[in-house]
């Protein structure tokens, strides 16, 4: 008779749905806590780096290699609670330090206000794209392949411009990168609220990289156009 007890079946389904919804809410909250912590530690890393500007510039490749090592350490420690959080914060702290040469260049050309301008613009973009991801009825998962192909194109163009050294080509690359990672913000945000990530740390590092790359792109554009004005 239990097979035909529709009330019990509905109650069990409702309880299961509520449980899954509660778990997802907890997942999203934890993700954004880790994301906020990552931004905070990156800011601290950048401030400490600016206070020791000459040393950071002199050993910038050492810090860059350390950042890459921390990133791969984070990837390999995904399934190790505690260690993965440590590697996340180590990576984000080092990424703040490696921003110092770019920050110093922009400050020298456009002043400290340009940093706040870039940060404000990045925050606005992040907020708008996050809201779009939550409000849209479109399934942004279909963008995944297109975004990945665009990412490869941007990386290849960036490598080519290392040899060309063209400021205007760099503006095009930075503009394309800003648009690309703005779209990634929406893409990753929707994936997070759909529960597509294995852990909050995976989700947080995706959001952090999106935010960081939009910020870097805007800084590069400001720096190049400030140079043209001088």
From Swiss-Prot:
Which residue spans traverse the membrane? 34-54, 56-76, 87-107, 111-131, 146-166, 167-187, 205-225
**Cited InterPro entries:** Bax_inhibitor_1-related
Its localization reads: Cell membrane
CDD domains hit by this protein: BI-1-like_bacterial
Q: Which domain of life is it from?
A: Bacteria
Membrane-topology annotation of the record: Multi-pass membrane protein
- One GO MF term attached to the UniProt entry: calcium channel activity
> What do the Gene Ontology cellular component annotations say?
plasma membrane
One biological process term in Gene Ontology? regulation of proteolysis
Does the UniProt entry include the keyword Membrane? yes
**Any idea which UniProt keywords this protein has?**
Cell membrane, Membrane, Transmembrane, Transmembrane helix
Keyword match Transmembrane helix: yes
Q: Please tell me where this protein is predominantly located.
A: membrane
Q: To which protein family does this belong?
A: Belongs to the BI1 family.
Name of the featured protein: Uncharacterized protein HP_0920
Q: Which organism encodes this protein?
A: Helicobacter pylori (strain ATCC 700392 / 26695)
